[in-house]
Amino acid sequence: LVLDEPTAGLDPEERIRFRGIISDLSQQKLVLLSTHIVSDLEAVANEIILLRKGVVLEMQKPASLLEQLNGQVWLVTVPAADETALTKQYTCSNVMHTDGKSVIRLLSESAPRPDAVPTAPNMEDLYLYYFGR
């Protein structure tokens, strides 16, 4: 069964329900799910194939793919005024603003700053690692 973006446009409740259906179907059939909604992959995928222009980049279990990024995802807390310089220099997967500071989640092979804290990679980080800038 091939499903192309099956949860696009669904509200969160329907997305959860539909992912349950996909999971049930996968017990009896091979289900290929094409999506950029990484939360869908986290919820139902036993194995992930990353494709770029028809070429297989990776084909592994989600945990194995995420392990590749260990030590390459960092949290950095900086004054909000310094945010732009970091997000231009590194691939950024998230920014949270609090009390005049920016907590930035960055992808980098080494610590982007001495005060950077390593954090566990997630599927969005994985997506950006392979398909981001």
Question: Where would I find each of the regions flagged by the language model?
Answer:
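Catalytic Walker B motif of ABC-type/P-loop ATPase nucleotide-binding domains
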Residues: 1-5, 10
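Short, flexible active-site loop motifs that bind/organize anionic cofactors or intermediates
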Residues: 5, 28, 55, 113-116
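Residue-level recognition of hydrophobic positions within alpha-helical transmembrane segments
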Residues: 10, 36-38, 120-121
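Helix N-cap at the start of a conserved alpha-helix in ABC-type nucleotide-binding domains
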Residues: 12-14
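ABC transporter nucleotide-binding domain
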Residues: 18-106
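C-terminal coupling/interaction segments
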Residues: 94-133
